[in-house]
Amino acid sequence: MAFQQHGNQEVRNRKILQGLEEKKRQMMNQQQGGGAGPLPGPSHVARPPTDAGNTSASRIHEPIVRYPNQTHQLAISQRQALEHAHSVSPGFYITQDSMYGNLILPVIPRVESE
């Protein structure tokens, strides 16, 4: 009798796993543009102003164009970089979307002089 209950649990577990795999496949298709609807338009992220004497200043004022799936990938990259930095360094880091491509920045506390 216990064997039969174990078999039923196995069948339920397989059905749950199959359902999860199907949902995963559907989500992957939607992310890759295989979804039923069109992809949402790009989101614009304005860059911060820089020094006017810089020769590349005109380029920097252009907005960064990102599509939603690129933003998701950036978030994954930031999280991985942050976890790696925390695991190999005793310092404290924050995620930052900088115009120089830095995914994380170290936080350096201010120490008041005595």
From Swiss-Prot:
Query: Which BP terms in the Gene Ontology apply to this protein?
Result: DNA repair
Report the superkingdom from the record: Eukaryota
Task: Give the source species.
Answer: Nematostella vectensis (Starlet sea anemone)
Positions of region (Disordered): 1-61
> Residue ranges under compositional bias (Polar residues)?
1-10
**What's any one GO cellular component for it?**
SOSS complex
Protein's recorded name: SOSS complex subunit C homolog
Q: Give the family per the record.
A: Belongs to the SOSS-C family.
